[in-house]
Amino acid sequence: MTPIEAPERTSTGPDGAIIGRVLPWLLALGGAVGLVAATALLVEKLKVLADPDHVPACSIDPVLSCGTVLTTPQAEAFGIPNPILGIIGFSVVVTVGVVLLAGARPPRWFWLGLQAGTLFGAVFVHWLIFQSLYRIGALCPYCMVVWAVTVPIFWYTTLHNVREGRLPSTPGVRRITDVLVRYHSTVLCLWAAALTVAIAQAFWTYWTTLI
């Protein structure tokens, strides 16, 4: 009697399958949105450099003000305008998404590289969020678009890699991941809610003047 072998751990369950189907589209479309936002931000940055009196199109009021953010040291965290990093990163993300949609099955090292890149993006975005809320005191609408796509890209890439066994994990970690996969959209909603509360709290004095 032939023993039945345990199936390899992959995203074949209903929840894992959803992650696997969503990720390529998220990379392609979310990356494209991020690329457009980063490009628009770079254009505004160049206009500000050419004309210090230029008012960016994304400067709406004292709080929603790209002009304020673009002229801070944080806007060039690594010695070059942050949008350049965004253009490079999102170009890679879009390419990966298109490759996956075409049916390619990249090797593990490829996925680990994507994981490292999205992790860097997520950490950098949260540093920028902190700087915007508590140091600069202004929000850049184009930057917020980048925030809104970077975190989901990191989140779904991480869930997919853990589910597929590409990242080191223990049985306990995998059980936790199974729960997170089941509530993948809920986690993102909680993150968005927490960010909304933080923004409301940071600029509460200004918001109340609009009532």
Regions found by a protein language model. Name each.
Residues 1-211:
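Secretory/periplasmic and organellar redox-cofactor proteins
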